[in-house]
């Protein structure tokens, strides 16, 4: 009789424990992916501080009008996206998996917040970049300095120095 009660208890409550275990694992996987992306962003920021423009880049930029500098944050954004691409792809995969399999409210809230922070895009700066003349666009896209994250304010200060 005791064995039957124990077996009945296991059959009734084991699925709840298993579901909680899976939910905990999904939440942990999601947190790990977010942390990995955060670490990569910090690494890319360090790259930005170490990335210094060449003299030819500075002299090229000195001849440009002030309106040209409004596209530099967008160019830096593109470089940061390139730098963090693998981690964002991994996070997107984990988000998709957890989103379709999770029912816990805290996990769902974490998913929504992470999606907003990580994958929201402002296209207004892209318009300014696309409106550049072909020579300027080609220079930026082919220049090694702009292919890595960089300090936008530091670059502007170097260009405006006399």
Language-model segments: what does each one mean?
Residues 14, 37-38, 74-78:
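Processing junctions and N-termini across compartments
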Residues 66-117:
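Mature extracytoplasmic domains of secretory-pathway proteins
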Residues 45-49, 106, 148:
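Residue-level signal for secondary-structure boundary elements
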Residues 107-162:
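C-terminal amphipathic alpha-helix
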Residues 65, 72-73, 133, 144:
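Residues that cap or delimit alpha-helices
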Residues 19-66:
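Immediate post-signal-peptide N-terminus of mature secreted/exported proteins
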Residues 1-21:
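Classical Sec-dependent N-terminal signal peptides that target proteins to the secretory pathway
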């Amino acid at each position: 009789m005791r064995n039957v009660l124990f077996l009945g208890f296991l059959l009734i409550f084991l699925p709840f424990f298993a579901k909680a275990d899976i939910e905990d694992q999904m939440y942990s996987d999601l947190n790990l992916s977010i942390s990995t992306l955060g670490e990569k962003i910090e690494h890319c920021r360090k790259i930005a501080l170490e990335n210094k423009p060449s003299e030819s880049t500075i002299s090229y930029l000195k001849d440009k009008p002030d309106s040209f500098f409004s596209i530099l944050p967008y160019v830096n954004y593109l470089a940061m996206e390139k730098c963090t691409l693998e981690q964002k792809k991994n996070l997107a995969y984990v988000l998709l998996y957890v989103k379709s399999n999770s029912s816990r409210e805290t996990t769902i809230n974490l998913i929504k917040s992470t999606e907003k922070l990580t994958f929201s895009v402002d296209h207004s700066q892209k318009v300014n970049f696309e409106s550049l003349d072909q020579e300027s666009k080609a220079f930026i896209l082919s220049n090694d300095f702009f292919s890595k994250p960089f300090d936008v304010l530091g670059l502007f200060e170097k260009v405006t120095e006399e």
